[in-house]
Curated annotation (Swiss-Prot):
Reactions it catalyzes: DNA(n) + a 2'-deoxyribonucleoside 5'-triphosphate = DNA(n+1) + diphosphate
EC number assigned by the record: 2.7.7.7
Organism: Xanthomonas oryzae pv. oryzae (strain PXO99A)
One protein family per Pfam: DNA_pol3_finger
Gene (UniProt): dnaE2
Family: Belongs to the DNA polymerase type-C family. DnaE2 subfamily.
SUPFAM superfamilies: PHP domain-like
Claim: Transferase is one of the keywords in the record: yes
Keywords linked to the UniProt accession: Cytoplasm, DNA damage, DNA repair, DNA replication, DNA-directed DNA polymerase, Nucleotidyltransferase, Transferase
The keyword Ligase appears for this protein: no
Function of the protein: DNA polymerase involved in damage-induced mutagenesis and translesion synthesis (TLS). It is not the major replicative DNA polymerase.
GO molecular function, one term: DNA-directed DNA polymerase activity
GO cellular component: cytoplasm
Protein name (Swiss-Prot/TrEMBL): Error-prone DNA polymerase
InterPro entries in UniProt: DNA_pol3_alpha_NTPase_dom (IPR011708), DNA_pol3_finger (IPR040982), DnaE2 (IPR023073), DnaE2/DnaE/PolC (IPR004805), DNAPol_HHH (IPR029460), NA-bd_OB_tRNA (IPR004365), PHP_dom (IPR004013), Pol/His_phosphatase_N (IPR003141)
């Protein structure tokens, strides 16, 4: 086998393996076909339809994708192919897509094994049978934990009792057929029960054929040929064997009877089948396949209608709510342009019959607002004037240029996408509201298909092949360190593996085949599917891993193909942070704000942003965004919209970023490729940055319709992978050149479309996010204590650890006040971090004094909120007399006592950590002293030295309010001639420097071609270090494993952006001893 042999139809360019799937099936099929040994289909060979075939959605059983299976079936001349995954219809939509391209008819089915061992396949005959199979799968899956199923004969009998006939049952007799099983199946399904004869070129095939034919005659069942197919081609047996070993958690050498005896469970040529099966069995299979006429693409779906009150239609009620929203959003009346947009959109919604969908989203948002849960719509829905009127989105149509086609189009044969973000800590309340509103029969989350990636695949494969754990780890690290500049073979050899070793070669080949191979189903981050009828009539429903949640077996791409609407209820940590911050500002500072009422266009806020003083704020907190801020210098809200969108693959790949910056800085004249597109490009100085701009350019400059422009944008990534991109480039070029546009501009536009096909922001989405960017920045600038406190209380979220947040708040900046932070103390601390002291805000002229932050007990490692609440409740009743009183009234167990002592949280009661440890150790088994015994005097304990205290702080609280660790190490740094970060400020551009700091962050952007960005911190601040890919590979261990990293390199200062270009790296972590420091890596 070669490397190419191992990858049949695997789309390695697709992020997530399947995105976007609906437009690249043909490409994946071509890839599968390219590697198929073309079977000669001669006259005279029998016709055939395969009735029992597992795809890769029979997890860890099926070795081939639907694309590979249908491509093979097409080449072998099959008339039909049944996808019969085990107790699942999760892969059936992929089968539908592959069927459409190949012309091989899809038969819908599923395989089942009952708890008594009876095995059979159900094949859907017609529209009556499909919901019956869905219902049986649902029953089985809901009766077991996630990933399993449980089904008994009584369940099957109940499902098919007194229903219209619509399925065929195919009995799978097994190695030792038990006639009683077949008789039972025949009792349930009558003449619709068949016996599957499955022969795989084994020694006893002849005898088995006779036994099964006799058994069929005895039971009065028709026998049909069937393949028990687990792979498209014979050579995939090694993959199937490996999956079997993984499934059974055994090395291949110990799998024994778990493995098939040969590779015959593939889609065999019709000539080969004719040499194995009697013609009658092959003809019976074809005849049965012909009776299965069900077309899954024809299933009907109705959105819930109970939100429409009596006397209204969905259309009239949506109109009523929209008009009410207009009066609220625009109390002074709306412009003619907005009215025109709303009327046009309402008409299109009615035409597409999406009213109930909009009403459902509006209802969910209404519930959240009634519960004081912050929420905001985003994505392309922010192009909707109706969504704004309904209160779903926050982008005012008067303030931005909307392009409705980006959200909703008459020609687009797919539902609109409305994403709504909710506070991440309270999103579950919203999900449970949906479940209560519609019931678990009619509401469920969409699935997400978890696929193997290189690292996870090689771990499982190497383990199956018996590689020792240490070698598995080495091999896996090669995959975790991928970049396009160093071939995989080289990385593996550098790790010490011999590619000529047959064992290593096999491991690598199977690993490549398993890349993007489905591993299991998980739940979508928040995509709800809601139906007017039970969902199990449309798609099987199963239990999720989390309690009180259920998921359907289709993912978001399946839903799009099947035209099922989903409501995305997503979780956003920054909304939690902002809500908690606003509550603190209201309660402690006397300022009652919402996101909408925060003072707009605040100059001090923009000054802070321009300095990249944005640790912890929304979106513009990453190192890449921070590097952009001093160059772009946002000075108004629209600049924030651009800032959010500009550091994305679309503008970057289209080479639009630097021209825009040069024009913004006055280094390049603002010009337009044509007066006809000046209005489109004027907001971005003649440079297209947003998806909507590119679409409008295509419409004006290349005579595309709205739908054509959007289809091109959405489909470009799939076309590129399929190799058909040039014809579309040619079409755009010819049309634009015909209107006088320069070739360089045309190429830029096309490259940007390609980038957007991978990942890019529409302007509407960027504007939605910019609202939160501004809100978080305003709060950080004007209420730094409340913001830092709210951010700590919203953890985990964002790029920065609690330690970095606290360091940033205490450090302050020229634009922002410093904040005092007080330690955790059981005498004063609540569970949450709180504000203490300060003076309330009175006016702009009298802003008061910033309060201090008292760290809460949530920061203490190993302490639960339940214990903390007991401490607070007991303290509220009366002050603690001593440690014994605390432990008694708060019912502290040994774990809680130790956690509080280690965290230094008893400072206010007994003093330093050593004293606290001793005091807590003496709490157990205290007995009354004997009469006359002298009282035991407290023992004075010397405080731990500074290094021990800091070490204990990080270990128990994750941060320290004492000296920064680097301050303690500064004398040793000076001996090594290592500079502090503060020393860099006076260094000219291009200077050679040697610095060191704690590693707080590592990032590897997808567009950076292997470059790693590292953030270092010392007692004076942070810097960004750029590590080129060649150095990253050479100093890999120091880069990935260092807690304290020394860097020699070149200091660069350009346009207010400062960073260090690494020339060499050294790990100095041994100087920290056992100190473990938090680092947010590769988020």
């Amino acid at each position: 086998m070669s490397w190419d042999d191992a990858i049949e139809g695997v789309d390695r360019d697709t992020p997530g393996g399947r995105m976007p799937r609906a437009w690249n099936v043909a490409a994946r099929l071509r890839a599968a076909n390219d590697d198929i040994s073309h079977a000669h289909v001669a006259d005279g060979v029998p016709t055939y339809a395969e009735l029992h075939c597992l795809s890769d959605f029979s997890f860890l059983r099926g070795a081939s994708s639907a694309e590979q299976l249908f491509a093979r079936a097409q080449h072998c001349g099959y008339s039909a192919l049944a996808i019969t995954d085990e107790c699942s219809l999760a892969g059936i939509v992929r089968g539908l897509e592959a069927s459409r391209v190949t012309g091989v008819r899809l038969i819908v089915g599923s395989e089942f094994t009952l708890i008594d061992g009876t095995r059979f396949v159900l094949l859907v005959e017609n529209a009556h049978g499909y919901p019956q199979v869905c219902g049986l799968v649902t029953t089985a899956r809901r009766a077991a934990s996630k990933g399993a199923y449980r089904l008994g004969r009584a369940d099957v009998e109940a499902q098919f009792r007194d229903v219209a006939p619509g399925v065929f049952a195919l009995w799978l007799p097994g190695v030792q057929p038990q006639a009683e099983q077949g008789a039972w199946l025949q009792q349930v399904f009558g003449e619709r029960a068949f016996l599957a004869v499955e022969l795989h070129r084994e020694q006893d095939d002849g005898a088995r054929l006779q036994v099964l034919q006799a058994l069929a005659q005895q039971l009065g069942m028709t026998a049909v040929a069937s393949g028990d197919v687990h792979m498209a081609q014979r050579r995939e047996r090694i993959v199937q064997d490996t999956l079997t070993a993984i499934r059974h958690t055994l090395p291949l050498a110990e799998c024994g009877a778990h493995l098939f005896r040969n590779g015959e469970r593939h889609l065999r040529t019709r000539r080969a089948l004719g040499n194995i099966y009697p013609d009658a069995l092959l003809q019976a299979a074809v005849a049965l396949a012909q009776r299965c006429t069900f077309d899954i693409s024809k299933i009907s779906y109705t959105y819930p209608r109970e939100l429409v009150p009596e006397g209204h239609t969905p259309t009239s009620y949506l109109r009523q709510l929209t008009e009410a929203g207009i009066r609220k959003r625009w109390p002074g009346g709306i412009t003619a342009k907005v009215r025109e947009d709303i009327e046009k959109e309402l008409a299109l919604i009615a035409l597409k019959k999406y009213e109930a969908f909009f009403l459902t989203v509006q209802d969910v948002v209404r519930f959240a607002r009634e519960q004081n849960i912050l929420c905001q719509g985003r994505g392309s829905s922010a192009n909707s004037a109706v969504c704004y009127a309904l209160g779903i989105t926050a982008v005012n149509p008067d303030e931005t240029r909307l392009l409705m086609a980006r959200f909703l189009s008459e020609k687009r044969d797919e539902p609109p996408d409305i994403d709504v973000d909710f506070e991440h800590e309270r999103r579950e309340e919203v999900l449970q509201y949906v479940y209560r509103k519609y019931g678990r029969e009619r509401a469920a989350l969409a699935a997400t298909v978890i696929c193997y990636r290189g690292k996870s695949a090689v771990r499982d494969v190497a383990k199956a092949f018996g590689l020792p754990p240490d070698q598995i780890a080495l091999l896996a690290n090669c995959y975790g360190w991928g970049n396009g500049e160093t071939p995989m073979e080289q990385r593996i050899e550098e790790a010490g593996f011999d590619l000529a070793n047959p064992l290593i070669n096999k491991i690598l080949l199977v690993t490549e085949h398993l890349r993007d191979h489905p591993r299991h189903l998980s739940q979508h981050v928040g995509g709800f599917v809601i139906s007017d009828e039970p969902l199990s009539l449309l798609v099987p429903v199963e239990n999720a891993a989390m309690a009180d949640r259920t998921i359907i077996q289709w993912d978001k791409d399946d839903l799009e193909t099947m035209k099922l609407l989903k409501v995305d209820c997503l979780a956003l940590g920054m909304l939690t942070c902002i809500r908690k911050t606003l509550d603190l500002v209201r309660g402690h500072r006397g300022r009652d704000y919402s996101i909408a009422t925060l003072p707009g266009e605040d100059l001090p806020t923009y000054k802070m942003i321009q300095r990249a003083d944005t640790v912890g704020v929304f979106q513009i907190e990453s190192r890449a965004q921070m590097a952009m801020l001093p160059r772009l210098k946002p000075a108004e809200f629209y600049d924030l919209v651009i800032e959010v969108a500009i550091v994305r693959p679309g503008p970057i790949q289209g080479d639009m970023v630097h021209p825009y910056l040069r024009r913004r800085q006055g280094r390049e004249d603002v010009s337009y490729p044509s007066p006809a597109v000046e209005d489109i490009l004027k907001p971005t100085l003649g440079v297209p940055l947003f998806q909507e701009q590119v679409m409008e350019l295509l419409m004006h400059a290349a005579d595309y319709t709205e739908s054509e422009a959007d289809n091109l944008r959405r489909s470009m990534a799939a076309w590129r992978r399929g190799g058909d991109m040039e014809q579309h480039r040619t079409r755009v070029r010819e049309r634009m050149q015909g209107k006088g546009y320069a070739s360089t501009f045309i190429d830029q536009i096309f490259e940007q479309i390609k980038g957007f096909g991978s990942y890019g922001f529409p302007q509407s989405h960027a504007a939605s996010f910019a609202k939160l960017v501004y809100a978080s920045c305003w709060l950080k600038r004007h209420e730094p204590a409340a913001f830092a406190c709210g951010l700590l209380n919203a953890q985990p979220m964002g790029f920065y650890s609690a330690s970095q947040i606290v360091q940033d708040a205490r450090r302050g900046s020229p634009e922002r006040e410093r904040v005092e932070v007080l330690p955790v103390d059981v005498v004063h601390s609540d569970w949450d971090n709180t504000l203490v002291g300060g003076r309330p805000w009175r006016s702009a002229a009298d802003p008061g004094e910033q309060p201090a932050i008292r760290l809460g007990m949530r920061q203490v490692a190993g302490l639960s909120d339940v214990v903390a609440q007991r401490i607070v409740a007991a303290r509220t009743q009366r002050a603690f007399a001593d440690i014994g009183d605390l432990c008694l009234r708060a019912a502290l167990d040994e774990k809680a006592r130790l956690a509080l002592a280690e965290a230094g949280a008893l400072q206010g009661m007994v003093g330093n950590r050593n004293a606290a440890r001793w005091a807590m150790a003496g709490v157990e088994a205290r007995r009354p002293l004997l009469p006359g015994s002298p009282e035991e005097r407290p023992v004075a304990f010397e405080a731990p030295h500074a290094g021990e205290e800091i070490l204990a702080d990080y270990r128990s609280v994750g941060l320290s309010l004492r000296q920064h660790p680097m301050a303690l190490l500064r004398p040793q740094m000076r001996q090594r001639r290592i500079l502090g970060l503060r020393d860099l400020q006076g260094r000219p551009h291009g200077s050679g420097v040697h610095v060191a700091g704690l590693v707080t962050q590592r990032q590897r952007p997808a567009t950076a071609k292997g470059t790693i960005f590292v953030t270092l911190e010392d007692e004076h601040g942070m810097i960004n270090v750029i590590v080129w890919s060649h150095l990253a590979l050479r100093r890999r261990r120091a880069l990935l494993e260092s807690r304290l990293l020394a860097v020699r390199g070149r200091w660069e200062r350009v346009d207010g952006v400062e960073h260090l270009i690494a020339g060499d790296l050294h790990d100095l972590s041994d100087l920290l001893g056992d100190m473990q420091l938090p680092s947010r890596d590769f988020h």
